[in-house]
Amino acid sequence: MKNIASRLALAATLATTLLSAPIMAQELNGTLKKIKDTGVIALGHRESSIPFSYYDDKQQVIGYSHELMLKVVDAVKADLKLAKLDIKLMPVTSSNRITLVQNGSVDLECGSTTNNTERQKQVSFSN
Protein backbone atom coordinates (compact mmCIF):
# COMPACT_ATOMS: atom_id res chain seq x y z
CA MET A 1 0.00 0.00 0.00
CA LYS A 2 2.87 2.36 0.84
CA ASN A 3 4.47 1.63 -2.53
CA ILE A 4 1.27 2.49 -4.39
CA ALA A 5 0.81 5.72 -2.44
CA SER A 6 4.44 6.66 -3.12
CA ARG A 7 4.03 5.92 -6.81
CA LEU A 8 0.86 8.01 -6.96
CA ALA A 9 2.59 10.91 -5.22
CA LEU A 10 5.47 10.69 -7.67
CA ALA A 11 3.05 10.47 -10.59
CA ALA A 12 1.21 13.59 -9.44
CA THR A 13 4.46 15.48 -9.04
CA LEU A 14 5.63 14.45 -12.47
CA ALA A 15 2.23 15.18 -13.99
CA THR A 16 2.44 18.68 -12.55
CA THR A 17 5.88 19.10 -14.03
CA LEU A 18 4.85 17.71 -17.40
CA LEU A 19 1.71 19.79 -17.55
CA SER A 20 3.62 22.90 -16.51
CA ALA A 21 6.63 22.54 -18.81
CA PRO A 22 4.86 23.59 -22.03
CA ILE A 23 3.53 26.70 -20.29
CA MET A 24 6.98 28.21 -20.52
CA ALA A 25 6.74 28.12 -24.32
CA GLN A 26 5.38 31.13 -26.19
CA GLU A 27 2.23 29.44 -27.37
CA LEU A 28 0.04 26.91 -25.58
CA ASN A 29 -1.51 24.00 -27.41
CA GLY A 30 -3.35 20.79 -26.67
CA THR A 31 -4.85 20.17 -23.26
CA LEU A 32 -3.32 23.20 -21.55
CA LYS A 33 -4.66 25.52 -24.25
CA LYS A 34 -8.11 23.98 -23.87
CA ILE A 35 -7.96 24.43 -20.09
CA LYS A 36 -6.83 28.05 -20.38
CA ASP A 37 -9.41 28.90 -23.05
CA THR A 38 -12.34 27.31 -21.20
CA GLY A 39 -11.30 27.91 -17.58
CA VAL A 40 -12.29 24.30 -16.86
CA ILE A 41 -10.25 21.19 -16.10
CA ALA A 42 -11.94 17.79 -16.31
CA LEU A 43 -10.79 15.23 -13.75
CA GLY A 44 -11.55 11.56 -14.23
CA HIS A 45 -12.25 9.76 -10.98
CA ARG A 46 -13.28 6.30 -9.87
CA GLU A 47 -16.47 5.97 -7.86
CA SER A 48 -15.50 3.16 -5.50
CA SER A 49 -11.76 2.53 -5.65
CA ILE A 50 -10.97 2.87 -1.95
CA PRO A 51 -8.58 4.41 -0.81
CA PHE A 52 -7.70 6.07 -4.12
CA SER A 53 -10.93 7.61 -5.35
CA TYR A 54 -14.45 7.08 -4.05
CA TYR A 55 -17.57 8.84 -2.82
CA ASP A 56 -17.97 9.72 0.85
CA ASP A 57 -21.27 9.75 2.77
CA LYS A 58 -22.17 13.10 1.19
CA GLN A 59 -21.42 11.86 -2.35
CA GLN A 60 -18.26 13.99 -2.53
CA VAL A 61 -15.21 12.53 -4.28
CA ILE A 62 -12.36 11.79 -1.86
CA GLY A 63 -9.22 9.66 -1.77
CA TYR A 64 -5.48 9.74 -2.44
CA SER A 65 -5.81 10.03 -6.21
CA HIS A 66 -8.35 12.81 -5.95
CA GLU A 67 -6.15 14.78 -3.54
CA LEU A 68 -3.18 14.42 -5.90
CA MET A 69 -5.25 15.65 -8.83
CA LEU A 70 -6.31 18.69 -6.81
CA LYS A 71 -2.62 19.50 -6.26
CA VAL A 72 -2.06 19.28 -10.01
CA VAL A 73 -5.08 21.56 -10.57
CA ASP A 74 -3.57 24.15 -8.20
CA ALA A 75 -0.26 24.03 -10.09
CA VAL A 76 -1.95 24.33 -13.50
CA LYS A 77 -4.07 27.24 -12.27
CA ALA A 78 -0.98 29.05 -10.99
CA ASP A 79 1.13 28.33 -14.07
CA LEU A 80 -1.63 29.47 -16.43
CA LYS A 81 -2.14 32.54 -14.23
CA LEU A 82 -5.87 31.89 -13.95
CA ALA A 83 -7.83 33.69 -11.24
CA LYS A 84 -10.36 30.86 -11.34
CA LEU A 85 -10.23 27.30 -12.65
CA ASP A 86 -13.43 25.31 -12.50
CA ILE A 87 -13.21 21.59 -11.89
CA LYS A 88 -15.47 19.20 -13.77
CA LEU A 89 -15.58 15.78 -12.15
CA MET A 90 -16.24 12.86 -14.47
CA PRO A 91 -16.63 9.30 -13.21
CA VAL A 92 -14.47 6.83 -15.12
CA THR A 93 -14.22 3.06 -15.17
CA SER A 94 -11.40 0.72 -16.09
CA SER A 95 -13.19 0.24 -19.42
CA ASN A 96 -13.57 3.88 -20.44
CA ARG A 97 -10.80 5.88 -18.74
CA ILE A 98 -8.30 5.64 -21.62
CA THR A 99 -10.94 6.52 -24.22
CA LEU A 100 -12.12 9.53 -22.21
CA VAL A 101 -8.57 10.86 -21.95
CA GLN A 102 -7.99 10.23 -25.66
CA ASN A 103 -11.12 12.06 -26.79
CA GLY A 104 -10.54 15.00 -24.43
CA SER A 105 -13.54 14.40 -22.18
CA VAL A 106 -11.08 13.97 -19.29
CA ASP A 107 -7.95 16.11 -18.98
CA LEU A 108 -6.36 14.21 -16.10
CA GLU A 109 -6.89 10.76 -14.62
CA CYS A 110 -4.85 9.65 -11.66
CA GLY A 111 -5.40 6.13 -10.50
CA SER A 112 -4.19 2.59 -10.63
CA THR A 113 -3.98 2.54 -14.43
CA THR A 114 -1.02 0.36 -15.32
CA ASN A 115 1.62 2.08 -17.43
CA ASN A 116 2.44 -0.47 -20.12
CA THR A 117 3.69 -0.37 -23.71
CA GLU A 118 0.24 -0.80 -25.25
CA ARG A 119 -1.30 2.00 -23.21
CA GLN A 120 1.68 4.28 -23.90
CA LYS A 121 0.64 4.10 -27.55
CA GLN A 122 -2.78 5.46 -26.56
CA VAL A 123 -2.13 8.13 -23.90
CA SER A 124 0.73 9.86 -22.09
CA PHE A 125 1.79 8.72 -18.64
CA SER A 126 3.93 10.37 -15.99
CA ASN A 127 6.45 8.11 -14.31
Regions found by a protein language model. Give the residues of each.
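Bacterial N-terminal signal peptides
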Residues: 9-20
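Short, polar/charged alpha-helical segment
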Residues: 29, 56-79
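Acidic, polar ligand-binding/catalytic clefts
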Residues: 70, 82-127
